[in-house]
């Protein structure tokens, strides 16, 4: 049913956000509701169950479309490819108990606030809905639902200081408390009965209930009883697991809801519990450690916080107060990407506070409850984003095909039994029975079996996963983005030297640690104070770069409070003093008065410091090219660029230093960043060694050999990044590096892009960080169609993405190095790679890479935390060796899923074909025969087939990602035909045997006791004869020569396909390494052969088998042996023959439809690509890329179709 697109009926919720939804208004109609209730009763609840599964049908049946303003029910639909519906009832919040009269409106809410705009007058009610724990209220004026529980974004910096700096009034607090709800992240432990009902109503168990009822009606007591025993056990285990998760999550958040805070309103300070806080409240942060109960904007003072809960990194982060800017920009726009530097996030720990001039640290509550950072984390756990992996979609489609297959069998069954004069009730039972045989309800669940065991193996290797459904995706990864510092290179940098500048000329380089005699001066003072280090439990903590720089000075941090600073009141400040090993200095200490923390967007940090009895000075440290632009031109050496290139080309990490003296009279906290970071004096370059981790080269070599492309995404200098890429083996020494520079033309809406070869700088031996001769054999980049690599900065990437978007895919195809990238640019880059149909992995340290780690198909955070919200995967070992490990396990899990899927599909089909054959003679399998096949064979195989571990070597192609690929479909179809052929052959041949008799089932074996009959099994089927209608016939129940033959052949055939489908190399270990599985198969085969050759009357009677001559038993074994040989030969010689499929693709000129592959073929024909030493302006560029490159297909051998 389509939706009315009328504006009043339809709107968008959370536009542009990750959880964007469409919302439709509906009004309940009494007559429709009455008809639905009647339908529930008449259908015995089946209609109600259907509406439970499909909430949109429930709304469409019970309600009529209306405007959102009139709606009492809303229907929500996600805007992703899944289009998932959910139903929510509209509720009303009454505030009449707070607002007594119309005259009180102004004192409760400002006119421009959502609280005023949502209040319906004169009823004094607010219309609201709650979606995924977030409350939305109806904005009467904007005619839309808006989120509450957060401070409005339109406030300016100055407005936040003036409006909320002294707190809200009691009446404002009361109104906001009622509308926003309590500041709690309330995750109640779900009662067991609720979990039980939810699990029982799962379609899988509903189908099982239907099957059990049908089996009881047909007297299939044993199998039905087995299912009744197994299902509650399975449900109980699932409910227990869900309950444990619920308890664990509740423990994670319970401390959040019981924190005491000091708040302030217009009447003064007050102690209150954190759940009373509302957006706009002002809280005072006291000294000492504390957990934050909400997101808050720091408006005075400074805080050191531990954000490991958010990023996985335990490095302390400095938060500074929001500037009091006098412009009309909203505060987030004014602060741009740096707004987080002023925000204290819920769930993080305040380690240390530093008061302002009045000794107070104040913050304004920004967001409460589930709107906070911690609330967002909890919601992501409660409502995980579904993954669009075609394997699961194909599984459901295949299930639909099996249902259609079963429908054919039902028609056949009805015809056979009806033509033989069976009762209508019996015909219906038999027809329905076909569905329970042909359609295994566990088929989609079979795809997850490999994931469960893989997750356990990963945990043993120190790789933790909070999103198991992404494990299969790891098997498809063909491009990995790596952060540089701390990921490819060592986290702890070594200080190599200082290149001081004086009088706009560089002086001699001062090496570390050989040269300890650093002279006292501005450059030395910059190294002493320009950092964000703190002393925590007696140890200096902070950024590793800052730690190395500071330790080289031999000064110490005296981090105590109450230092008297000339011209100011007593304040909490950090004082740096000379240590015992420090050189003689002319001052007793330097006090850090204020700090502007490092910003990835600005590429620098600054501090304001004051020597004891001296003047205030500002010191800046950051990217050299950025720092140089902030300095007076006459202080920057003329050979600045060549010197910078000299060191960065060797792989050094280079930091620029600058300073200036500040005029007295203005308080440090009143100075803006722009005032401080201007007209600086350039001090020199700090040179740090950026050594590769020992695992980097072997891992990148392994990925390259597997044709998995590696890309570097870093915040460092482009020359340093290119050098590290060369040393690591990402770029071969014989390949060209082309620098892409894009610039926006000032004062216009146009831009230009230039391609030029990157300058090579031959360096002296003593400066080489990592000589090329030491790298051994170089690695050829896996995915490069040409012998060149693009390198670009974050600024150029942004300009290309904005002005030359049609060129971006062509650049990304060969881009290997991205330098000076901000966190948002990293996320954008990953998304752009995904648009080219790459399966993208991202490996970083979890701090500045958070966004990219979440966006990537597989984000891997290198962190000491067991699990980080920064990414789906966390490696406790800080090494990229986890990347190939994860890919190996992902490939193994993916192949296991395919093996299980094929086995489940074939097992049900074999049983289905056997039953239909016997239906021709109005016969079927016996209860214990079904029981043996389903439990003793299939269940045990399903549990042990997934034990096979990953193959240790990564091969240069990926496993298939879709079930509808030609090799897999051919494998399934051929094996179905082999099984069908063998069963029909056995069925017909047994009837041609001289000892065969329809009526005398003991004629073949004279040694059997005279005509022992199983009266109990005979009565259980309730059939009358075998088509001939001979009145002298004896009813033998299920027992017949056809039954014995078909059942034995089909049972052992299940073992054959289990062995044939259990893939080993190249993605999993050989099958013989799975000892448990091999023992199971051998044991099951032994039991089956025993049933074939045994002559035990009681056993045969129980299993509804009849005795046959030994020659016929040997004939059955020979048929099975031929089937095994043919199946194995076809699987190995055709299905798994990679060379054959590549030849077929080449013969029929099949090409991958993946966007990047199509683009490669286009560029291979373009002799003018890449352009060198050319500049394109915006209006001069023509589009040469195919316009219709949409869609995604990743057939079986898509990853490297031309290489092999």
Curated annotation (Swiss-Prot):
**Membrane-protein topology:** Multi-pass membrane protein
Pfam families per record: Cation_ATPase (PF13246), Cation_ATPase_N (PF00690), E1-E2_ATPase (PF00122), P5-ATPase (PF12409)
Q: Which UniProt keywords apply?
A: ATP-binding, Magnesium, Membrane, Metal-binding, Nucleotide-binding, Phosphoprotein, Translocase, Transmembrane, Transmembrane helix
Per the UniProt entry, the Enzyme Commission number(s) are 7.2.2.-
Membrane spanning residue stretches = 33-53, 220-242, 398-418, 434-454, 898-918, 930-950, 968-988, 1044-1064, 1076-1096, 1114-1134
Residues at the active site: 483 (4-aspartylphosphate intermediate)
Please list the reactions this protein catalyses.
ATP + H2O = ADP + phosphate + H(+)
| EC top class named in words | translocase
Is Transmembrane included in the keywords of this UniProt record? yes
From the record, what ranges are coiled-coil? none
For this chain's UniProt record, which GO biological process terms are given?
A: intracellular calcium ion homeostasis; polyamine transmembrane transport
Q: Which family does it belong to?
A: Belongs to the cation transport ATPase (P-type) (TC 3.A.3) family. Type V subfamily.
Q: What is this protein called?
A: Probable cation-transporting ATPase 13A4
- What is the species listed in this Swiss-Prot or TrEMBL entry? Gallus gallus
Which classification does the entry list for the species?
A: Eukaryota, Metazoa, Chordata, Craniata, Vertebrata
């Amino acid at each position: 049913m389509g939706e009315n697109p009328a504006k009043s009926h339809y709107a968008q919720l959370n536009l542009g956000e990750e959880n964007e939804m469409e919302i439709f208004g509906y009004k309940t109609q009494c007559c429709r509701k009455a008809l639905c209730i009647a339908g529930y009763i008449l259908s015995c609840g089946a209609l109600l169950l259907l509406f439970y599964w499909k909430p949109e049908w429930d709304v469409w049946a019970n309600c009529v479309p209306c405007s959102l303003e009139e709606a009492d029910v809303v229907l929500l639909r996600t805007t992703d490819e899944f289009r998932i519906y959910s139903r929510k009832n509209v509720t009303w919040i009454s505030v009449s108990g707070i607002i007594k009269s119309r005259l009180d409106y102004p004192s409760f809410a400002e006119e421009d606030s959502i609280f005023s705009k949502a209040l319906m007058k004169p009823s004094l009610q607010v219309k609201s809905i709650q979606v995924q724990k977030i409350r939305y209220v109806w904005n009467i004026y904007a005619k839309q639902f808006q989120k509450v529980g957060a401070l409005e974004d339109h406030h300016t910096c100055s407005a936040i200081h003036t409006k909320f700096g002294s707190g809200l009034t009691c009446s404002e607090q009361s109104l906001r408390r009622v509308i926003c709800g309590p500041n709690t992240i309330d995750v109640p432990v779900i009662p067991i009965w609720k979990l039980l009902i939810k699990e029982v109503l799962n379609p899988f168990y509903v189908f099982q209930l239907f099957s059990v009822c049908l089996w009881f009606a047909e007297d299939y007591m044993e199998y039905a009883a087995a299912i009744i025993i197994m299902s509650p056990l399975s449900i109980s285990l699932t409910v227990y697991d869900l309950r444990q998760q619920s308890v664990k999550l509740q423990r994670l958040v319970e401390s959040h809801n019981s924190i005491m805070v000091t708040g302030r309103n217009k009447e003064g300070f007050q102690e209150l519990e954190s759940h009373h806080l509302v957006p706009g409240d002002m809280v005072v942060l006291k000294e000492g450690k504390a957990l934050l109960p909400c997101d808050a904007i720091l408006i005075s003072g400074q805080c050191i916080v531990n954000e490991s809960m958010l990023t996985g990194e335990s490095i302390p982060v400095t938060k500074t107060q929001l500037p009091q800017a006098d412009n009309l920009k909203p505060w987030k726009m004014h602060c741009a990407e740096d707004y987080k530097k002023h925000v204290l996030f819920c769930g993080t720990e305040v380690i240390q506070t530093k008061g302002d001039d009045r000794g107070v640290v104040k913050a304004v509550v920004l967001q409460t409850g589930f709107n906070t950072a911690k609330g967002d984390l909890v919601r992501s756990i409660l409502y995980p984003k579904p993954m669009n992996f075609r394997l699961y979609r194909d599984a459901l489609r295949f299930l639909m095909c099996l249902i259609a297959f079963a429908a054919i069998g039902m028609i056949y069954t009805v015809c056979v039994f009806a033509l033989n004069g069976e009762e209508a009730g019996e015909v219906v039972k038999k027809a329905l029975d076909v569905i329970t045989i042909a359609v295994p309800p566990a088929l989609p669940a079979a795809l997850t079996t490999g994931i469960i065991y893989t997750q356990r193996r990963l945990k043993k290797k120190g790789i933790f996963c909070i999103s198991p459904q992404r494990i299969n995706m790891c098997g498809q990864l063909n491009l990995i983005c790596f952060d540089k510092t701390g990921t490819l290179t060592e986290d702890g940098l070594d200080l190599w030297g200082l290149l001081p500048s004086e009088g706009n000329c560089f002086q001699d380089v001062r090496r570390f640690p050989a040269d300890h005699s650093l002279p006292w001066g501005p450059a030395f003072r910059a190294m002493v104070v320009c950092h964000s280090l703190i002393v925590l439990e007696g140890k200096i903590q902070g950024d590793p770069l800052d730690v190395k720089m500071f330790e080289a000075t031999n000064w110490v941090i005296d981090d105590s409070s109450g230092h008297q600073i000339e011209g100011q009141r007593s304040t909490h400040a950090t004082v740096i003093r000379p240590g015992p090993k420090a050189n003689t200095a002319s001052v007793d200490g330097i006090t850090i008065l204020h700090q502007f923390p490092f910003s990835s967007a600005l590429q620098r940090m600054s501090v304001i410091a004051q020597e004891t009895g001296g003047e205030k000075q500002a010191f800046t440290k950051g990217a050299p090219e950025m720092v140089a632009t902030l300095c007076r031109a006459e202080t920057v050496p003329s050979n600045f660029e060549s010197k910078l290139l000299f060191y960065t080309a060797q792989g050094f990490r280079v930091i620029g230093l600058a300073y200036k003296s500040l005029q007295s009279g203005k308080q440090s906290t009143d100075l803006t960043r722009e005032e401080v970071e201007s007209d600086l004096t350039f001090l020199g370059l700090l040179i740090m060694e950026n050594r590769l981790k020992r695992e980097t080269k072997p891992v990148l070599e392994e990925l390259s050999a597997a044709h998995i492309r590696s890309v570097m995404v870093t915040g460092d200098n482009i020359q340093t990044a290119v050098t590290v890429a060369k040393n690591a083996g990402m770029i071969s020494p014989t390949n060209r590096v082309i620098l892409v520079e894009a610039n926006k033309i000032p004062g216009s809406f146009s831009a230009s892009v230039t391609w030029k070869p990157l300058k090579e700088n031959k360096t002296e031996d003593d400066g080489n960080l990592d000589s090329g001769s030491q790298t051994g054999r170089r690695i050829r980049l896996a995915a490069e169609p040409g012998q060149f690599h693009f390198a670009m900065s974050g600024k150029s990437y942004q300009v290309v993405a904005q002005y030359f978007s049609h060129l971006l895919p062509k650049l990304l195809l060969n881009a290997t190095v991205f330098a000076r990238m901000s966190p948002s640019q990293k996320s954008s880059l990953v998304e752009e790679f995904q648009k080219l149909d790459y399966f993208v992995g991202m490996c970083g340290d979890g701090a500045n890479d958070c966004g990219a780690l979440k966006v990537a198909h597989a984000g891997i955070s290198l962190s000491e935390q067991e699990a980080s919200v920064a990414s789906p995967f966390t490696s406790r070992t800080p090494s990229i060796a986890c990347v190939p490990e994860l890919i190996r396990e992902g490939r193994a899990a993916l192949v296991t899923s395919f093996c299980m899927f094929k086995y489940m599909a074939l097992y049900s089909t074999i049983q289905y074909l056997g039953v239909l054959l016997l239906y021709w003679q109005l016969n079927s399998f016996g209860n214990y025969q079904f029981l043996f096949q389903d439990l003793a064979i299939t269940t045990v195989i399903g549990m042990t087939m997934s034990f096979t571990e990953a193959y240790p070597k990564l091969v240069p192609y990926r496993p298939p990602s879709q079930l509808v690929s030609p090799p897999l479909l051919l494998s399934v179809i051929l094996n179905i035909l082999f099984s069908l052929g063998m069963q029909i052959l056995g069925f017909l041949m047994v009837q041609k045997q001289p000892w065969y008799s329809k009526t005398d089932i003991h004629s073949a074996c004279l040694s059997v006791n005279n005509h022992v009959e199983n009266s109990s099994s005979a009565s259980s089927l309730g059939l009358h004869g075998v088509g001939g209608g001979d009145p002298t016939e004896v009813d033998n129940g299920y027992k017949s020569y056809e039954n014995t033959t078909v059942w034995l052949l089909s049972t052992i055939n299940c073992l054959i396909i289990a062995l044939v489908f259990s893939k080993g190399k190249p993605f999993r270990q050989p099958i013989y390494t799975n000892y448990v599985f091999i023992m199971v198969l051998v044991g099951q085969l032994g039991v089956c052969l025993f049933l074939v050759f045994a002559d035990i009357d009681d056993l045969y009677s129980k299993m509804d088998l009849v005795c046959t001559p030994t020659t016929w038993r040997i004939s059955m074994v020979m048929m099975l042996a031929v089937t095994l040989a043919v199946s194995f030969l076809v699987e190995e010689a055709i299905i798994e023959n990679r060379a054959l499929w590549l030849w077929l693709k080449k013969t029929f000129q099949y090409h991958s439809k993946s966007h990047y592959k199509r683009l490669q073929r286009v560029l291979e024909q373009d002799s003018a690509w890449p352009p060198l030493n050319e500049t394109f302006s915006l209006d001069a560029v023509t589009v040469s890329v195919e316009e219709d490159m949409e869609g995604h297909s990743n057939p079986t051998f898509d990853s490297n179709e031309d290489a092999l």
